[in-house]
Amino acid sequence: MTWGEQNTQEEGFEQMDYAIDQGVNFWDTAEIYSIPMREETYGETERIIGNWFEKTNKRNKIVLATKVCGNTSNKYIRGGGYNFGKKKIAQALDESLKRLKTDYIDLYQLHWPDRRMSMFGADGLGYKHYEAETVPILETLNVLSDLVKSGKIRYIGLSNETPWGLSEFIKYSEQLDLPRIVSVQNAYNFLNRTYELGMSEFHHRSQVG
């Protein structure tokens, strides 16, 4: 996530060479990287990875994950606003595939929910409800299902999601025979233990990675 901002392409190449030599073959990135987010470096990390694939011809050695961003105020990302409708997800995926110089993504993740919600403690204490229009979860899941069928993505995942959001995705996948969420990438470290409050049990009982 730092390649293209804090790290050069050459440094990124060195890190990827070292990673694969050490047997690290699951690589995760996102369309918004490098970090911190800004228009000038949007998509740069994906481009560097794609350039490495082109140089080394080792795409088939890597399990590749990337993410599409959710609701955003950044107008340079598809005009801003909600991002999980059919047109915007399809556009985001095609642009990621182009930057990554590949024709498929192994794990395609929703970087954060399209609905407005508290993330990383930004709204203070606890849950705060927002009444706002958003792309329904079922609509988003149907879009992802079509992209799985097309062969452009193999599996789907979430990121920065809540137990309620995950439960909705699982509910629809089971009721309607749609692709199932295989993983959720949430913050979990010494300072942030919120995963243990609800998501850890949910993941274990629902067999989500």
Where are these regions (language model features)?
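Short acidic capping loops at alpha-helix termini that bridge into adjacent secondary structure
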Residues: 59-62, 103-107, 154-155, 179-182
